[in-house]
Amino acid sequence: MAPKTKKGCKVTLPEKPVKLASHTRDTTGVSQMFPSSKARTKSLLGDDVFSTMAGLEEADAEVSGISEADPQALLQAMKDLDGMDADILGLKKSNSAPSKKAAKDPGKGELPNHPKPAGGAIPTKKSLPSPSSSGHQNRRFSSEDLEDPLRGLLSYDEGGITKQPPVTQSKTASDKSPSTVRDQGPSIPLTPGDTPIRKKEELLFDDGDDIMATLGFGDSPKAEKRQIGDQEGPRPARSTLDELLGRGMATKLLARPGTGEHREFKLDKKYQRPQDSEDMWGDEDFTFGAYQPTVVSSEGRQSRRQSVSRFFADSGADPKGEPGSKQSPPMASSPIQPRKGGADWLGLKDEDLDLFPASPTREAHRESSVPVTPSVPPPASQHSTPAGLPPSRAKPPTEGAGSPAKASQASKLRASKEEKEDWLSHALSRKKSQGLAREQHAGTSEGLHLAGTAGHPPSGSQPLTSTQGLEHAAAGGSSGTTARERPCVRPGVSGSPVTQNHAASALPTGSPKRGTAPGDLSATEPATCFPSTQKPTEPSVPVQPLLPESLARSLLPSTEYQKQLLAAQVQLQCSPAELQAELLHSQARLAELEAQVRKLELERAQHELLLGSLQQQHQADLELIESAHRSRIKVLETSYQQREERLRRENEELSARYLSQCQEAEQARAELTAQHQRRLAAIAQEKDQEMERLRELQRASILDMRRDHEEQLQRLKLLKDREVDAATSATSHTRSLNSIIHQMEKFSSSLHELSSRVEASHLTTSQERELGIRQRDEQLRALQERLGQQQRDMEEERSRQQEVIGKMEARLNEQSRLLEQERWRVTAEQSKAESMQRALEEQRKVTAQQMAMERAELERAKSALLEEQKSVMLKCGEERRRLAAEWAEFSAQQKLSKERAEREAERALQVDTQREGTLISLAKQAELKIRASELRAEEKQLAAERAALEQERQELRLEKERINATALRVKLRAEEVESMSKVASEKYEEGERALREAQQVQAEQQARLQAVQQQQERLRKQEQHMHQEHLSLAQQRLQLDRARQDLPSSLVGLFPRAQGPAASSQSALMPPAPTTRWCSQPPTGLDPSPLHLHARLALLRHMAEQDRDFLENEQFFLETLKKGSYNLTSHSA
């Protein structure tokens, strides 16, 4: 399985190698070719046009090198295809049309009519053991095609012409069978597998990619030859030159047999079939176009050997007894032999090809090295190169045949194998030796070829035998070299296939040169019977197709070998002049091809320069876009910085405003607290003033009571003095005693009256005082209770008012704070909205400017790109026209030699020019598509940016609406806060009024309390005054008692003792009024004065006791009042 090329599978590289692979594919079986083509189509549907054009170009550019037997091989290869006939035949038509013309003379009518004419080409194209192996080889190539995607690019151009050298044989076959090949040719480029594998990713310009190859400009045969070297590595000039010269492919293959793979050439067991099944298809005949799905089946591999047996039966030899046919299976042990180096597949070491440039033996050697899989027999298409064509025409396809192998093998053995050997030096040395050998054997080969064609019987065995002898004779000089260069291949194994290939290709070589139509026809007609009976049992024989022909001939019967030797000698003798002419033509073509290679290299350099300029322009565009993006980012950064600075300033202003408002609130709070403190101080002063006023009132009342009491005491003192004077005057004399008694009585009566009056007044006053005091006490208690209740109510009301005031203040502060916050937020949002609007406007302006700049840049870039594309396309058109002119010159030279080659060259030039035009248009389309994709991407980017801007506008609009809604909410909130603040102020005023009323009530209560306290003080003073009066009275009584004791006892005896206690008890029990009445009654029968005095004294004593008790009670009462007054003052305080 050939791996793909390393650099993304450059599709244009393997086109000519793919041709050679297609020859191998045709020999292995066309039925297997199509699965690979299908698999390849899946990945390369978009590149069918490139592949089709490449296939047409290659097929038509190399038409002159196709052998006459190619149409027959094509028919055999296309026999067993199911649904792919139309596609395959499409491409074959363009390739094989010249071959039809070439074959018109020998047997034009037999090609379409006979089902086996395709097989007739096989004996002439491929080795003897596989004359009918084209069907089998086509089958085997399909498996190889699945493995090597690069092999099917233009393989179907020679798909039906499997036995031809990649270029020349397809042309010859198209000349020989025009109708059949044209039916088959044009459909082949349409098959998916034959399309060049151009991957869409290669349109992306990579530094290591070949732009010309990617765009399809390298699809020409010259470009393909250059690309053969690219698959193996970077060897542009040397490899291309050697490929154009046709050097070293087979020779290097012989020199390095193990280059493709380091495995022994052993045939796989599944391909080694017993000889008993060789005759399965031997007796079957097929009409042209008949569908036999089993013809190309796995049994078809043995049909090749069977047809070979048949061939040798016609020549008198037993094919089954032939050692070469039995030993050939181990010849190709490696299933993937096409992975050899570029020199091996290019056949630079093949001396036989150089010795006989026009002979099909060269072609056989070259294309026998093409087989890719072990099941691929030596491609018969290699041997169908007409002798008339220059060897260079057959060599480039031979060189291109190695490209699929190199493509399959590039990843493994590319660098290591080419570094080990200098295959170019070997190719040059072998070229010199081959030139000498060519001159020596020219005459002999010519004579032998003429003899072989003259004695050609119409049967298929006779021309085959003659061609075998011719090839063997021609290969005699190079057999030693080929045997020496193949150390890994057993001579017995490889001899038969090589000999058969040479013999098969000998007849068409001679016939086109000399124009012997009967010989060609006889060689072609009997060959048509072979394809149906071919069942190749040697799938891997083509691995080493360049075995010495002498060994192969030695395996044949002696009579056959002698006949072939004689034919080869005659041909060698007759052909020196023609070989020399062909050598001159090949040299001229070599010079032309070298010039074309140089032109193509220059063209590639120009395209690389164009790519560099495009890349520079693209880089400039990218830099411009980046600069615009950077400028936009800078503008955005500046706008955002300005916005941030603006927001910072607003934040600072708002914070300063908030601090000032906080300070104002603190000042207001301090003022309110100061006012409250002043009010409390005024209330305290008023309370103290009321207390002082009450105290003054009480003092005044007490002073009045004291004054009254003192006046009474003064009167009592006067009375006492008078009594004392009376008592002292009574002791003077008795006469005066009566007077004194009378006076005493008067005095006692007056005293009694006075005492009764005093007592009555005292009782009344005391009672009144007691009642007044009780009433006052009750009033005082009630007032105290009421005052305490009012104080408690005032305290509660004050606490409630204070709480309400505190709550209202807190609520007012909170509402004011919230209001300020809302105002700040509203102002911040408004400023933010304004700043965002300004920034949005700036962004809009900036984006509009940037979009305008970008549009202008895009227009300029588009115009510049279109101008460059136009200039490049004009240059490409000029180069293509120049190449077309060179192709015209080359066709003119070919027309001088052969009319058929001239027509084919003209057709190839026409197809090439058409292909170039289509390639130019496709390249333009590709570039336009790329630019359109870039423009679409830019448009998408602009659309995305526009959508982003629209989205930002939407967001800003929504933000603005949200800000407006927030502003409305804030306004409503502000109104609510204002209304609440009004309500709070009203409530605060109500609280102030209630506080003032409470303070007034408190002041009134304080005034009342002070008045009560003053009254209490006044009463206390009065009590003290009365107490003093009582004390004075008690002293007076004591004095009276002393005075009574001082009286004479006679006065004391007057009073009955029994009546004393009674009187005392009566005085104690009776009120003072009856005592006074009793005292006022004078005693009967006794002296009234001493009794009266005694009674008066008892009465006074009793009154003194009563006064003492009264004073004690008053004192107790005053003490209780003092305690109560202190409590009241403490409560009021």
UniProtKB/Swiss-Prot annotation:
Transmembrane segments: none
GO biological process: apical junction assembly; cilium assembly; establishment of epithelial cell polarity
Coiled coil: 577-727, 773-870
Subcellular location per the Swiss-Prot or TrEMBL entry: Cytoplasm, Cytoskeleton, Microtubule organizing center, Centrosome, Centriole; Cytoplasm, Cytoskeleton, Spindle pole; Cell junction
Covalent cross-link Glycyl lysine isopeptide (Lys-Gly) (interchain with G-Cter in SUMO2) as placed by the record, residue numbers: K960
Amino acid composition bias (Basic and acidic residues), ranges on this chain: 102-113, 221-245, 259-276, 415-424
InterPro entries (alphabetical): FBF1, FBF1_C
Chain spans, region Disordered: 89-198, 211-544, 1062-1085
Protein name: Fas-binding factor 1
